[in-house]
Amino acid sequence: IALGEIEEKNDHLEHQFKWPEGKISDKTGINKRYIANDSQSTESLALEALENLNNEVSLDKIDFIISVTNTQTNIFPALAYSIQTNSKFPNAQFIGLNAGCSGFADALLLAYSGIASKLHKRVLIITSDTYSKFIKDDDQSIRPLFSDGASATLIEFNEEGYVLENFISNVAP
């Protein structure tokens, strides 16, 4: 994973919005948010998450990369092509999904379909968003809910069945 560099705790928003202490955590279970600094973007967080995953597992022979974002810096091309341009996956197919909350589930369905049909063996899903760059500072309904961050998930074929492995990098406390 990769997270926005600025840590914003609930007490900051509760003070700003004149809310009672503990309101955000009590209603949402969220204790803090990670906000991208000025030099961080959806694309840079995606590439950082990819690098962090590559430090944990080999990303050789990736044949399909799916990117998911709702907040890419440019209207086009898709985040997937920014990843393709800035990484080394010469034989991979790339597709970009413009999706929010359901995006990871949509990407999992595409990954499963590609693997089940034997079209792909190693699929990389990269999700990345920087909602703080779009949500107004005074938006009391949405601002407490969203952090900026990215994840990179490797899905691959395994002849023995399903295996879930957990490799986490740059984990926030």
Which role does the model predict for each range below?
Residues H12-W19, S44, T71-Y81:
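A structural motif shared across PLP-dependent enzymes of the aminotransferase-like
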Residues F64-N70:
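Short glycine-rich or small-residue beta-strand-to-loop segments that form or flank ligand, phosphate
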Residues E43, L47-L50, L108, Y112:
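Residues within alpha-helical segments
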Residues T28-E48, T71, I95-S102, I142-P144:
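Active-site pocket-shaping loop/turn-to-helix segments
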Residues A49-D63:
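Phosphate/pyrophosphate-binding loops at sites that engage ATP/ADP/AMP, CoA/4′-phosphopantetheine
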Residues N55-L59, T73-P173:
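Acyl-thioester C-C bond-transforming condensing/cleaving domain
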Residues K23, N52, S82:
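Solvent-exposed, charged/polar functional surfaces in cytosolic regulatory/catalytic domains
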